[in-house]
């Protein structure tokens, strides 16, 4: 099963989501978007995790403000994406992530994996939602939410040269939450895992993906092949 469908959050809001469900899947993964919407890159991540055997969806979190948002990785895209992220706000976005988790829970254990804006939402999900694992890639607001306590096993990926997230903040997150697995990728920049960005680092992206799959499996979120 592949395609778009409508999710309904607990406040009645309806939003689009892109979904791929391989036959026989026994675990779910929610891919939480960057500030660029559910664009081709995010859909490719859904496809990639589904290829590993996970029932995978990406909810369109900007639907609360504007439908069908797919932004480019350029100056105007960044500016518009930041405006949309600020307009959505954390609480409504978390309602939509929760709807995605609930949708997948009939399949089995569910993990959330977020990128940039979504990385910070993955951090919040670890403390607020019934997820088996949470993974955040370069979540720029995690440090500002450092007082939140993850209840689910949590893995965080950061780039050493991320212009938006100083290493001092990364170290403070790691020190404040010693149970959280934190990895810093040498010479990697913000967005290093996205092959549509100039900052893409293939080696760091591959290592982070491998670590993510191992982390999910260690916490009971397994693909079909596992």
Model-inferred region functions:
Residues 1-226:
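N-terminal cap/leader regions of alpha/beta-hydrolase-fold enzymes
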């Amino acid at each position: 099963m592949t395609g778009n469908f409508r999710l309904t959050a607990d406040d009645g809001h309806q939003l689009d989501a892109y979904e791929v469900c391989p036959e026989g899947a026994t675990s779910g993964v929610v891919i939480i978007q960057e500030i660029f919407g559910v664009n081709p890159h995010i859909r490719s991540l859904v496809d990639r995790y589904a290829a590993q055997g996970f029932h995978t969806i990406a909810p369109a979190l900007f639907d609360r403000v504007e439908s069908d948002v797919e932004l480019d990785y350029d100056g105007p895209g960044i500016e518009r994406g930041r405006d949309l992220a600020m307009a959505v706000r954390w609480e409504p976005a978390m309602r939509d992530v929760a709807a995605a988790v609930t949708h997948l829970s009939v399949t089995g254990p569910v993990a959330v994996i977020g990128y940039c804006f979504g990385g910070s939402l993955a951090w919040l999900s670890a403390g607020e939602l019934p997820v088996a694992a949470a993974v955040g890639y370069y979540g720029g607001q995690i440090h500002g939410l450092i007082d939140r306590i993850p209840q689910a096993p949590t893995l965080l990926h950061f780039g050493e040269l991320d212009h938006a997230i100083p290493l001092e903040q990364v170290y403070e997150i790691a020190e404040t939450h010693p149970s959280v697995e934190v990895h810093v990728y040498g010479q990697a920049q913000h967005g290093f895992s996205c092959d549509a960005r100039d900052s893409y680092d293939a080696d760091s992206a591959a290592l982070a993906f491998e670590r993510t799959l191992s982390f999910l499996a260690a916490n009971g979120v397994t693909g079909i092949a596992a």
